[in-house]
Amino acid sequence: MFVKTGDTVKVIAGKDRGTTGKVIKALPKVNKVVVEGVAIMKKHQKPNSENPSGAILEIEAPIHVSNVQVLDKNGVAGRVGYKVVDDKKVRFNKKSGEILD
């Protein structure tokens, strides 16, 4: 998967199109990522000893990795390519040519 935890990404499809955020969690087995401040959903939590009345929490839902593009340091969104530099495989932005790792 071309997206890693900590990458800054731009959402290119869906209700949050155009939003940028940091990847909190990458889920490679299901090809999804959790992006900070994107795809907010409400989760109803049952009452427990800490919160006797229960709560409605707002958490980020995972979105499909095809709906995001990685941003480089200059804020240019583009597809991710791989190349070998100094016997090390690195990711780079295909649009700007800048190395991401």
Curated annotation (Swiss-Prot):
An example GO CC term for this entry is: ribonucleoprotein complex
Return the protein name: Large ribosomal subunit protein uL24
Q: Which GO terms describe its biological process?
A: translation
HAMAP family reported for this sequence: Ribosomal_uL24_B
What functional role does this protein have?
A: One of two assembly initiator proteins, it binds directly to the 5'-end of the 23S rRNA, where it nucleates assembly of the 50S subunit.
Q: What is the organism field in this record?
A: Lactococcus lactis subsp. cremoris (strain MG1363)
The lineage's top-level taxon is: Bacteria
Q: Family, per the entry?
A: Belongs to the universal ribosomal protein uL24 family.
Entries under InterPro entries matching the protein:
KOW (IPR005824), Rib_uL2_dom2 (IPR014722), Ribosomal_uL24 (IPR003256), Ribosomal_uL24_CS (IPR005825), Ribosomal_uL24_KOW (IPR041988), Translation_prot_SH3-like_sf (IPR008991)
Subunit structure of this chain's protein? Part of the 50S ribosomal subunit.
Question: Could you give a GO molecular-function term held by this entry?
Answer: rRNA binding
One family from Pfam that matches here is KOW
Q: Which UniProt keywords apply?
A: Ribonucleoprotein, Ribosomal protein, RNA-binding, rRNA-binding
